[in-house]
UniProtKB/Swiss-Prot annotation:
Originating species: Koribacter versatilis (strain Ellin345)
TM stretches of this protein: none
Protein's UniProt name: Large ribosomal subunit protein uL23
Domain of life assignment: Bacteria
Database matches in SUPFAM superfamilies: Ribosomal proteins S24e, L23 and L15e
GO molecular function terms attached to this record: rRNA binding; structural constituent of ribosome
Nucleotide-binding is among the record's keywords: no
């Protein structure tokens, strides 16, 4: 069963580094589904924002241990995707307002 674009793209990651690469490299940063592939991420961004994608880079993050008194647990593992747009492509409207 194919996943929808909204199941693959969880939310944009808005950090200083993310805003920096947005300006200099025309790259968008997203938190994505942990089992999403680069081609699925590329197709989801192209379908959702109607832009052409050049490359996709991903990074996996292991959840950190968190404690509440004597109880301990772990944050969930997650994946981040850096999506570079092709030259000449306009940034999506949500990214221009950041």
């Amino acid at each position: 069963m194919a996943k929808s674009a909204y199941q693959i793209l969880r939310k944009p990651v808005i950090t200083e580094k993310g805003l920096g690469v947005k300006e200099t490299e025309s790259t968008l940063v997203f938190e994505v589904s942990a089992n999403a592939t680069k081609t699925e991420i590329k197709e989801a961004v192209q379908k959702t924002f109607k832009v052409k994608v050049d490359t996709v880079r991903t990074a996996n993050f292991v959840g950190k241990e968190r404690r509440r008194g004597k109880f301990s647990g772990y944050r969930p593992d997650w994946k981040k995707a850096y999506v570079r747009l092709k030259t000449g492509e306009k940034m999506p409207e949500y990214a221009e307002n950041l």
